[in-house]
UniProtKB/Swiss-Prot annotation:
The gene is NUP192. Belongs to the NUP186/NUP192/NUP205 family. It comes from the Eukaryota. InterPro entries: Nup186/Nup192/Nup205. This is Nucleoporin NUP192.
Length: 1683
């Protein structure tokens, strides 16, 4: 046998995926046929001794040596499960390393086996090979009974272990949790075995095996008659007997004969289940006989073979057992509110015990005592004693029926799970369909028997005997059958519709027949039965019409009947009161029961009234509003009156009235007036809250009264008037009349909440029985939630932008009054009190270990928990609005005629967060609930945690580095389990949209608690698996820590991989793409943050994260579809469809993913360049840039940029044009379907604007031509249009932003590869050329429409070209230029010429073009090609460059002049320098020369403070300009042009050349802080340069004067010394700067004396240069000092 769960899990998954693995099925077939059995592998000495030797051999032949710890774990598991020790070892080895996981593997294996077998048996046709393989050799059929028995054995062993633990005082929480775990699995197994058994019957696998049928019946008969597990066999038996035609005739007759004998057995009465099954066999036997009358019916004697045995079975309790089957599986019996009505079931169940899950209980005796169904006639006797049935002090019938029974449960029974067992959906379906067929068969084929029973009962009543209700109920089998129908069909409209679908049917005829019953008990049961057939709108309408059209039993008759009884009881109370007064004077006791009987008020009357109320309540529950209104007119007044008299059915009457409450709030006035009058009209009230609460307790005297009242109150304050997609009441509306109670009490709704909170909820924990407690808690929590939703909080925030007058929008006198009336305010007030919020917290504090599984009826508990967490979440959402806005309004402006408790305040709570943080177990439970399957519970728990985290991060009080939530989660005992809960939720299968939304919220929670830069540890670090002690680490090798390999971080990586796996290049769906993006964002944040980056990178490298994700990295082409739709913006309609669907979500998510992944790669390579070896770095880099196999992977990252922009919106808005909508507030929709944005907040604002303007339509500002209705319609249309419009804007902006981010990240990645990638110069230069080949076409395109994108790529090109130049110098550079660079140069020229280019972009183009020209000048062929292309467009080019040089600010001035320099050099190679010609044709050259004066002006601005950066920039520009002019001066024509453009005149005007070399220049710098001064005065001379910083060369005067003298020399040399005019001008210049010339020569003489001529000091070298220039000029011009 295979003991690992893995092969069965694999087979199960193959079934789920729709691709059944037949080979694996054949391999595990023996295990499947063996079901859950391991009876041949129980613990034994041989295996134990082998294990204790330390070496074991597994079933597959492999051997292991094991240590003592492992041996101990294996023995422990073996003892607990009574399992072979070697098998225990195999289970542990197949799972994780603990016995607990071995146990999980054991039960999971069994679970998978049974699920697979059930699927094959029930879903495959009996002729299929798969099914035939499974049942061949009969092993499966022969094992199924043993499988059931094996579970009995294991449950029995569990009980023994419990007894042992209790004796040893080891029965702790952990032990109990372990027991519950095993019982849960065994219960599921039993349920699935039931399905398998049914399937085998259905497929006929056991139909020819009468011995098996009899042994199965014997097995069921031997079970205790109160064992709920009997129910699991009933679907198979019912279906078996319904399929008698499939059995051989001889077998049917043999069964018939056997059952006849069994009924005559004296001991048969002890086996009621067997009697009931035999009865059902006979019911079907009649039909079987009818199918072939000649061979079957004619050979039988109907009386002896059918009638008498069936009658005998009825007398032995067959119908009572059927009633128990129906009642203990009914939905209605699980509804505690049904106990408001008379518990007629206890009356009619006289002989047979109810079913209890006895095999799942620790102590069934306690449970049996508390659920004993035997009717106790003493209760009736008690009622007949002194107090009497209708005595005002009588506490109510409930004390003798179900509720009292439950209230009397001992405390410890509440600790039990399994108080209610619910069948799984599949088993339930089999059970319901087969049981329905049983009941319909009895109605159809056993009419003779029902008539016989009815006649016998009526004869008994007519016999004249004085029969008590107790006597009647003993033989009331027809009533039992009616009740069976009631319990079975109630709340199952899909089955009960059979009775109404055809008026000619036997089912409808049965109802007609029943309606003619005259006996009171029969009539009562008839009304109950019909009430069960009214569930569902259609059935309710049928019942409504049935009584409406029935002359003998009409609705009016029923109402009259209720009214008559009301008068009788009222008269009885008066009569009793008078007699009591008389008796006091005569000293005689009054027998109130005798008085009641005189008035005809006995227990039957209670039953009858209860059945009428049940009928009315059931019909009114689901009918439409028109029918409800009609019934309300008939019954409301009658029922109102009924509640005024003290009866045990007041609560029931309240429940029925609650069903009559109309949906429309304005129609509820009558109900409110009645209820308010009932409670307060006759009460003595004063100013105290206690007097108001006493008014309630005087009216609501019993548990049932309170329960009924709560249901009525909940329906009365329920919200119907709400806007679309909103759960809040329309602002300004109330669910009750304004100034409720005016005239006889303090007005308002507050007294109701005061009573509910202080008298009920605050004391609810005193109710012992858990089901009773929940029955009260549930309506109260619903009331609280409804109350919180009764105020639209968004209106206060939106009132200013909407220009709303709140007084005009409310139904009250003004807004302040509305606030005082609204239910939300009292609810907030009471929730802020400790006893109330603790009561709500107690609901949540049940803990994940006490959650009931679905099979044990966990629905009510789940609903309670859901409500409790939703309430907490809602309170946290709006508590600030209450504290800051609503509370002060009531406090300051509250009117005195309204009810307001004296202690109205915030009750010491600054914030509701404080209440939660003080309850540490609550916070821990919320963490654990994140992992449960219940989406509502998990989602709301997570949202509360998100708020708590945000609060504790941002609170002023929290100055410590650890926030409160992190501290709590890290310190509680459940810390590891909380982390495991998050892991479980993230790893759960995505079965619907809700699960997906929850995963995304969980990932958002983690992301929001992570920072890119902060070194503070957060809750996300803990949850992800870091150890967050003083120093963060990957933690120990324990589960949930990263080091162990089973952490939330690992789950995150798995989600990322799984999501990418489901994406192809053909189609990218929104959901997986969004999941992948969210997961990667978290990993990226951890890698960015210095706190975690080092730890995480080492872990990710070990896990081969780079390789795993790169393999799955999604690629896109122009044919890729996005969530099924192509990116097509060719038409407005296609673009609209794309944007308003999930497609745009898929597209944007992909862009975000691509951005994150590119960023990650850049960070990763940069990080590993420091820590890894050269070969390791190159491995990763080559993966990205290698092109040996296919195109470079790196370049595919830019593929998304090939898509065009999303087209701009063309909708025009009118109503919402000037609305101040903040598009940044619009978030992503939590669900991945439809429009991807959540416009909830925006819709609220637009809705308010629409309402305000509609109300103002007739004011001056609005046209009277539009009606209010028309305006509202137009506004609704425009609201839809607005959402479409904003969807487009947001999507377009987001796409542009993300595209730019992708590009920016890619640019950074390329830069990192080039600088940190450890590439050889030749490889790197080739890679750079490939990059140029990719980006140049893109630059060319982007220049025309997207400058921002161009700037990114051009800045990259500048960066790369610089490195390329350096690399080429290291490689033997032959002076040729790679042809691929020419396209770059052309693109630069195109960019410079583009009117869209920014100054910064042009500056980069100048640099690139200059780099290229610098290289091409040494290449003759290249130079000529460039010259040819430039000649054509040189005029415009020169104009643009010149413009930047002369008028530009920033780098373009310098880069432009450098490019002009290179262009001049290039043009010098042609006959005519067309560049220079272009400059000379206008004043361009003159203006360039004049720009030298800018520097002069800056240096002479002694009154202004100079910025150091400005100085350095200006000096750079000055030198660049001078060197450009020198370049121009290199030719005679150029020098001549300079002279013509006043070069020498401008030089003569430069003040800094006239400076005294000894005194120097005085400069004033700001932005330099010295002592108390904000500026600094500095003197710069020839000897003392200005040092800007310690690493830079100083700024010397030589920086300025050397270039100028070089320029003068260049002009003079080019013009020649024969040009007298030039020589004379230069002579004049030397004379002008005579002081400077003398100063330089002086310094030269001093140097010679000090022998510093050859010093390497930069200043010294500049002096040498200057001396040479002056000497040369003096020589060429013949200048003498005396000149």
């Amino acid at each position: 046998m295979k003991w690992s769960a893995i092969p069965f899990q694999t087979l199960y998954r193959s079934i789920e995926s729709g691709e059944f693995d037949f080979d694996l099925f054949k391999e595990v077939l023996p295990d499947l046929q063996n079901l859950n059995l391991n009876t041949d592998k129980l613990k034994n000495n041989a295996s134990r001794s082998q294990l204790e030797k330390g070496e074991i051999e597994l079933s597959d032949g492999s051997t292991f040596k094991v240590n003592q710890e492992f041996i101990f774990e294996a023995i422990s598991l073996s003892d607990e499960l009574n399992l072979d020790e070697i098998v225990a070892c195999e289970l542990i080895l197949s799972g994780d390393t603990t016995a607990n996981n071995g146990k999980v593997q054991y039960f999971l294996r069994r679970q998978y086996i049974l699920q697979i077998v059930s699927f094959i048996v029930n879903c495959f046709h009996e002729d299929t090979e798969l099914y035939q393989e499974l049942i061949k050799n009969g092993a499966l059929v022969s094992n199924i009974l043993s499988a059931f028995k094996f579970i009995h054995t294991q449950l029995s062993e569990i009980k023994q272990q419990i007894n042992k633990a209790q004796i040893l005082e080891n029965y702790n929480a952990l032990f109990q949790q372990n027991i519950k775990f095993r019982r849960d699995f065994l219960l599921r197994e039993y349920d699935i075995l039931s399905q398998i058994l049914y399937g085998l019957v259905d497929k006929g696998a056991i139909m020819k095996n009468k011995d098996f049928i009899l042994s199965l019946l014997h097995h069921v008969s031997e079970l205790d008659s109160n064992d709920f597990f009997i129910i699991y066999y009933t679907p198979a038996f019912f279906h078996l007997f319904a399929s008698l035609r499939v059995l051989p005739d001889a077998d049917v007759k043999l069964l018939h004969s056997q059952f006849m004998k069994d009924l005559k057995d004296d001991s048969i009465y002890t086996k009621p289940v067997k009697v009931a099954l035999i009865f059902i066999f006979f019911a079907y036997f009649i039909g079987w006989c009818k199918e072939d009358p000649k061979r079957r019916a004619d050979t039988m004697d109907f009386k002896t073979d059918v009638d008498e045995p069936m009658t005998s079975a009825v007398e032995l309790g067959a119908i009572e057992q059927i009633l128990i089957f129906a009642a203990d599986t009914s939905i209605v019996e699980q509804d505690k509110s049904m106990e408001l009505f008379y518990d007629i079931r206890s009356l009619l169940e006289r002989h047979i015990p109810r079913l209890i899950p006895k095999q799942l209980l620790d102590d069934e005796k306690i449970f049996s005592q508390t659920t004993n169904s035997t009717y106790n006639p003493a209760s009736a006797t008690d009622n007949m004693s002194g107090r009497g049935l209708w005595n005002p002090s009588y506490p109510g019938m409930m004390s003798t029926t179900g509720t009292a029974r439950l209230n009397s449960m001992p405390n410890n029974v509440n600790e039990y799970s399994y108080t209610t067992i619910v069948l799984s959906d599949q088993t339930q379906e089999f059970f319901l369909s087969s049981f329905d067929d049983v009941l319909q068969t009895i109605i159809t084929d056993c009419a003779f028997l029902l008539t016989k029973i009815k006649d016998a009962e009526e004869d008994s009543l007519l016999s004249g005997e004085d029969l008590t209700l107790d006597d009647i109920s003993l033989k009331a089998d027809l009533e039992r059958f009616f009740l069976s129908i009631y319990f079975f069909y109630a709340s199952r409209p899909e089955y009960s519709c059979t009775f109404w679908s055809d008026k000619e049917s036997n089912a409808y005829g049965f109802i007609e027949w029943c309606s003619r019953c005259n006996d009171n008990l029969m009539r009562s049961c008839f009304y109950l039965m019909v009430s069960s057939l009214s569930f569902g709108p259609e059935n309710a309408l049928n019942v409504y019409h049935y009584f409406g059209e029935n002359s003998s039993i009409s609705w009016k008759n029923i109402a009259q009947c209720l009214s008559d009884y009301t008068k009788k009881i009222s008269n009885f109370n008066s009569s009793l009161h008078k007699r009591q007064q008389f008796s006091e004077s005569t000293h005689n006791d009054i027998d109130s029961t005798a008085v009641a009987l005189e008035e005809g008020l006995n227990e039957e009357a209670v039953i009858f009234l209860s059945s009428l109320l049940t009928l009315v309540g059931s019909v009114t529950y689901q009918v439409d509003e028109d029918v409800k209104s009609s019934l309300s007119k008939v019954f409301s007044d009658v029922l109102f009156e009924f509640t005024k008299i003290n009866t045990p059915l007041v609560g029931a009457a309240f429940k029925v009235i609650s069903n009559l409450v109309p949906k429309l709030e304005s129609s509820r006035t009558k109900f409110w007036s009645f209820l308010d009058s009932l409670i307060f009209k006759d009460s003595s009230l004063n100013y105290s809250s206690e007097s108001y609460r006493n008014a309630f307790t005087n009216v609501l005297t019993k548990y049932s009264d309170v329960l009924g009242f709560l249901q009525l109150f909940h329906n009365l304050i329920s919200i119907h008037s709400r806007e679309n997609n909103s759960e809040y009441m329309v602002f300004g509306k109330l669910a009750f009349p304004t100034r409720l109670g005016q005239g006889y009490r303090k007005v308002g709704i507050w007294p109701y909440f005061d009573y509910i909170f202080n008298d009920i909820l605050a004391h609810v924990d005193q109710i012992v029985d858990i089901r009773n407690k929940r029955a009260v808690q549930l309506p109260i929590l619903k009331i609280i939630y409804t109350g919180l939703c009764s105020f639209d909080y968004s209106v206060i925030l939106n009132s200013i932008p909407a220009a709303a007058n709140l007084d005009a929008l409310v139904d009250c006198e003004n807004f302040f009054n509305y606030v005082q009336e609204c239910p939300a305010i009292p609810i907030f007030n009471y929730i802020f009190t400790e006893k109330i919020y603790k009561s709500i917290f107690n609901v949540v504090d049940v803990g994940v270990d006490q959650l009931s599984i679905e099979l044990e009826g966990g629905k009510n508990q789940a609903e309670l928990l859901q409500l409790a967490v939703k309430i907490i979440n809602k309170v946290l959402d709006y508590q600030e609005t209450y504290v800051e806005e609503l509370f002060p309004i009531v406090k300051k402006h509250g009117k005195t005629d309204y009810f307001l408790p004296k202690n109205y305040s915030l009750h010491g709570l600054r914030s509701f967060y404080d209440a939660i943080f003080f309850n540490i177990p609550l916070v821990a439970h919320l963490g654990l609930y994140v992992g449960v399957d219940d989406q509502i519970l998990a989602t709301n728990s997570l949202r509360i945690l998100a708020k708590l985290s945000e609060r504790s991060n941002g609170s002023v009080a929290s100055l410590s580095k650890r926030n409160k939530l992190l501290t709590i989660f890290d310190s509680v005992d459940e810390s590891a389990r909380i982390k495991d809960a998050f892991i479980t939720q993230l790893e759960s299968s995505i079965t619907d949209a809700g699960v997906l939304a929850l995963k995304l919220e969980l990932l958002d929670f983690l992301t929001s608690n992570l920072s890119n830069y902060s070194r503070t540890m957060t809750i996300s670090h803990l949850l992800l698996g870091f150890q967050v002690s003083n120093v963060i680490s990957l933690g120990p090798n324990l589960a949930t820590f990263i080091s162990s390999g089973t952490s939330l971080l690992d789950s995150l990586i798995s989600v990322l991989e799984a999501s990418l796996n489901s994406i192809t290049k053909d189609n990218i769906d929104y959901a997986p793409m969004r999941l992948a993006t969210a997961a990667l964002e978290i990993i990226l944040k951890l890698c960015r943050n210095p706190l975690t980056s080092g730890l995480l990178y080492s872990y990710l490298i070990k896990e081969n994260f780079f390789e795993r994700i790169m393999i799955l990295d999604p690629q896109v082409t122009r044919f890729t579809t996005w969530n099924g739709s192509p990116f097509d913006n060719s038409t407005e309609e296609k673009c609209k469809n794309f944007i308003e669907s999930e497609s745009v979500g898929a597209f944007l998510s992909f862009l975000a993913y691509r951005n994150y992944w590119t960023q990650y790669l850049g960070l990763f390579i940069h990080k590993i360049s420091f820590s890894g070896t050269k070969s390791e770095v190159l491995t990763y880099v080559n993966y990205l840039i290698s092109n040996t196999m296919y195109s470079v992977r790196l370049f595919s990252f830019l593929d998304p940029l090939n898509y065009g922009n999303i087209c701009e919106p063309k909708e025009t808005l009118s109503i919402f044009t000037n609305v101040p909508l903040n598009l940044e507030q619009v978030t992503l929709n939590k669900y991945c379907s439809g429009n991807i944005y959540d416009f909830h907040k925006m819709e609220n604002l637009m809705r308010l604007i629409k309402r305000v303007r509609a109300e103002s339509l007739h004011s001056n500002s609005f046209s009277l031509t539009v009606s209010k209705e028309q305006f509202l319609k137009d506004a609704d249309v425009e609201c839809i249009k607005a959402k479409s419009h904003f969807t487009n804007i947001i999507s377009r902006n987001k796409a542009l932003e993300l595209n730019l981010s992708v590009l920016h990240s890619w640019v950074q990645l390329v830069q990192i590869i080039v600088t940190d990638g450890k590439l050889e110069p030749s490889t790197r230069s080739n890679f750079i050329l490939e990059v140029f080949g990719t980006i140049i076409p893109k630059i060319s395109d982007y220049i025309e429409f997207n400058i921002t994108f161009s700037e990114e790529l051009v800045s990259l090109a500048v960066f790369l070209f610089d490195i390329y130049n350096r690399d080429r110098k290291l490689i033997t550079d032959k002076g040729t230029v790679d042809g691929r660079l020419y396209q770059l140069f052309k693109t630069c020229i195109q960019g410079i010429n583009s009117p869209l280019s920014s100054v910064a972009l042009r500056s980069d183009f100048y640099i690139l073009a200059n780099h290229y020209l610098s290289r091409v000048l040494s290449d003759q062929v290249g130079s000529e090609k460039v010259l040819q292309d430039l000649r054509l467009g040189s005029k415009k080019l020169v104009e643009i460059i010149w413009n930047d040089v002369v008028y530009g600010e920033g780098t373009s001035r310098v880069t432009g002049i450098l490019l002009l320099d290179s262009l001049i050099q290039l043009a010098n190679r042609s006959k005519e320098n067309f560049i220079l010609d272009s400059l000379m044709k206008t004043t361009r050259l003159l203006l360039i020369i004049r720009s030298l004066k800018n520097t002069d002006a800056l240096l002479n601005s002694t009154t202004e403070h100079i910025n150091i950066d400005d100085l350095l920039y200006e000096l750079t520009a000055f030198k660049a300009t001078v060197f450009f002019l020198i370049r121009v001066a290199e030719t005679r024509g150029g020098a001549s042009a300079l002279i013509e453009n006043n070069l020498f005149r401008i030089i003569a005007e430069l003040s800094f050349l006239k400076v005294d070399p000894d005194l120097g220049l005085d400069l004033m710098f700001d932005e330099v802080y010295v002592q108390n001064s904000k500026f600094l005065k500095v003197n710069v001379t020839l000897d003392n340069p200005l040092l800007v910083d310690k690493d830079a060369n100083g700024v010397s005067l030589f920086e300025l004067i050397v270039p100028i003298f070089q320029l003068i020399s260049a002009v003079l040399v080019s013009m020649g010394s024969s040009n007298k005019a030039v020589v004379q001008t230069v002579k004049g210049l030397l004379n002008t700067y005579k002081r400077l010339v003398i100063g330089i020569f002086k310094r030269d003489l001093l140097r010679e004396k000090e022998d510093k001529k050859n010093s390497s000091d930069p200043n010294n070298q500049s002096l040498n240069e200057m001396v040479k220039l002056i000497v040369m000029l003096c020589t060429l011009t013949g200048y003498q000092n005396n000149d």
